[in-house]
Amino acid sequence: MGSFVLHGNIIDSESPERLRVAADSYLVCEEGRCTGVFSALPERFSGLPLTDFGDRLILPGMTDLHLHAPQFAFRGLGMDLELLDWLNAHTFPEEAKYADLSYAALAYGQFVDCLRRSATTRAVVFGTVHPAATTLLMELLEASGLVSYVGKVNMDRDCPEALREADAAASLAATEQWLASARFAHTKPILTPRFVPSCSDALMQGLGELAARRGLPVQSHLSENLGEIALVQSLCPQTDFYAEAYDRCGLLSQPCIMAHCVHCPPEEQDLLQARGVFIAHSPLSNSNLSSGIAPVSAYLARGLRVGLGSDLAAGETENLFRVMAEAIRVSKLRWRLADDSASPLTVAQAFYLATRGGGAFFGNVGCFEPGFAMDAVVLDDSTLLHPQELTPLERLERCIYLADERHIAAKYVAGTRLF
């Protein structure tokens, strides 16, 4: 963690509806945290090292609330299927390969290198059922300089034998084994029941007890696909809606991320709000697997906590600029074709989701207010040619639709420069 000053065109979110622009300004970091943004550098900071990024854009680092590291290897493939068929045809066969640590080292190394080059500074990641491979993934992420949560997946039913843990007791024992090795400074464990169809009642109950006993966060999937929801209703007839199956086991009582939430009825939304659950909106995967379009603007309007997920590999890219653009795009389709009661997402709202919205899962993360972690990406958009001068906000909007890792000139996580 360092202390320094950056100069450039600084943009962050004040709220979901309001962006802050400080053109030709100074961002001060002390001991890894933001001190403030200033139009002129105060004398008291004149002794700090200054990096002048000139006309470049300085943005908060982005948080990916939901992605599957073992699926990185087959991103862009198998998009002609819906969720349950896609899992059986592509996901489960690939994840079974991670029993082989040499394969895991190669594949996870490629994944981490790609994530490090992206605009993502923090991520919440699914591994596989394999404790050793999941610990290896955590080691690689720790060395990368990123901040993350990583989960060893739990599955003891309704999945291929190569991935199915023997029973709830065996799955919980493997999880305890993994937790004993998952001791890193910036890469923390998160309990990860894959979803209700692949976890027995006993396993779900045991994970809820483990979460409460150890104070561990939880991540899973919720109401992604209509076929999945129907399956959960058949498996859990005593529940009124999907999220209740998690809540009965205490899995919503700890800090929790539920990915997708495409088809949540009002009573399910009420429960998520009451428990403070984070929704990981994953528009790329919801489009690719024909799952639907989550009513994200309505979620924001009622005060639900929402961030963005790339959802590799059902989402084809880790590039959160592309995820922001897709979130805006599909919200327009939902508004036009399905529900005109909630307006489409704006650029300001999408940017908030990628930065401050998801960053809140990690605490004071995702903007440049005093006391927030100094996570930043510096964009050089000079190759995105335009015949006239654009404002910083216009440049940001273009970057949401056009930028990728080639436009990232520098990246900081908790006050440390990665490149």
Where does each model-flagged region fall?
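N-terminal metal-binding scaffold of metallo-dependent hydrolase/deaminase domains
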Residues: 1-45, 56-57
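Divalent metal-coordination and catalytic microenvironments
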Residues: 9, 27, 32, 55, ...
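C-terminal cap of metal-dependent C-N hydrolases
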Residues: 15, 373-419
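Active-site gating loops and adjacent loop-to-helix segments of metal-dependent hydrolytic enzymes
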Residues: 73-106, 152-168, 225-253, 278, ...
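Alpha-helical scaffold segments that flank or form the walls of functional sites
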Residues: 75-146, 171-184
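Metal-coordinating catalytic core of metallo-dependent amide/deamination hydrolases
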Residues: 132-261
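His/Asp/Glu-enriched, well-ordered alpha-helical/loop segment
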Residues: 248-255, 297-385
